[in-house]
Amino acid sequence: MSKTLNIIWQYLRAFVLIYACLYAGIFIASLLPVTIPGSIIGMLILFVLLALQILPAKWVNPGCYVLIRYMALLFVPIGVGVMQYFDLLRAQFGPVVVSCAVCTLVVFLVVSWSSQLVHGERKVVGQKGSEE
């Protein structure tokens, strides 16, 4: 019985902490003059708490595992909502595909440039001139 209560406590604590960060983000978003989703601010709060080790990762791990495990199921309502606008998407299919392709290319270029900036040029092992 004690083990069962311990597992229930771990899941309860994890979800309470995740939801506390979510509602803190929603509250902060309501105070800001710009429109930023509260869920994004909540994720940033959770990230900062975990990165600074204010909040131990093992406290939120059980809840995160459950959410990640069933993540595909959480996208079903979004997909149904998008299908309500199918006619609009069909009419604007070309611009949507072009914008997705351009955005993908821009992200690829920015990531490659920033990776080159951070890591610099590295010599390949066995390449001529790499023996010094």
Curated annotation (Swiss-Prot):
Q: Which GO terms describe its cellular component?
A: plasma membrane
Write out the transmembrane intervals: 7-27, 31-51, 63-83, 93-113
Which InterPro entries does the record associate with it?
A: LrgA/CidA, Uncharacterised_UPF0299
Question: What are the disulphide bonds in this sequence?
Answer: none
Q: How does it sit in the membrane?
A: Multi-pass membrane protein
Q: Where in the cell is it found?
A: Cell inner membrane
Instruction: Tell me which UniProt keywords the record has, alphabetically.
Output: Cell inner membrane, Cell membrane, Membrane, Transmembrane, Transmembrane helix
Instruction: Name the domain of life this protein comes from.
Output: Bacteria
The UniProt entry's sequence similarity note says: Belongs to the UPF0299 family.
**What name goes with this protein?**
UPF0299 membrane protein YohJ
Gene of this entry: yohJ
